[in-house]
Amino acid sequence: EFDLVEIKLINNLDDKRGFCIDIKGHKSRAKIERGLQAHTCYSYQGEIAIDQGLDADRLKQKELFFPNFNVCVHPSSYNNPLSLTLIKCKNTKEFILDEDNTIRLKNNTNLCLTVAKEESRKGGGGSPVHLMRNLSMQICNNKHSVYQNWVIRYFKKGKIFKEKLSKF
């Protein structure tokens, strides 16, 4: 089977390789204290990168867990649910993987995981160069679906497969 999945924005925006949820910093040297971003998906290189790889089983439990760093995604605080932080897992299911392909905050379902509309920033590597955008929780809105609709991807026998959030 597969252990790691990536969560990819359905719309590729300005990078045909697409954008995935990513820990800031480079792969194994990612810095959890710097938090999350949307970054060119590394899967075009033939595997899911460790700083984009979420635990498939924990995701089924609605937990966004990065096993290689032993951290989960949590809202920074309930006063400031718009920003996200990476901390030791609290075993709390903070997110809803919704039918409409959004990732919503369980305690405030009006908030969706959202990629910034601003132009992408260029990263330090990749060919063509990797792109990055900010990631935050914003009010869910159909008009912003290109920035708020996600899909789960994984490799099986060397091929990449897609799965709807709600089917996962």
Model regions and ranges:
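Lectin-like carbohydrate-binding module/patch detector with strong preference for beta-trefoil
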Residues: 1-168
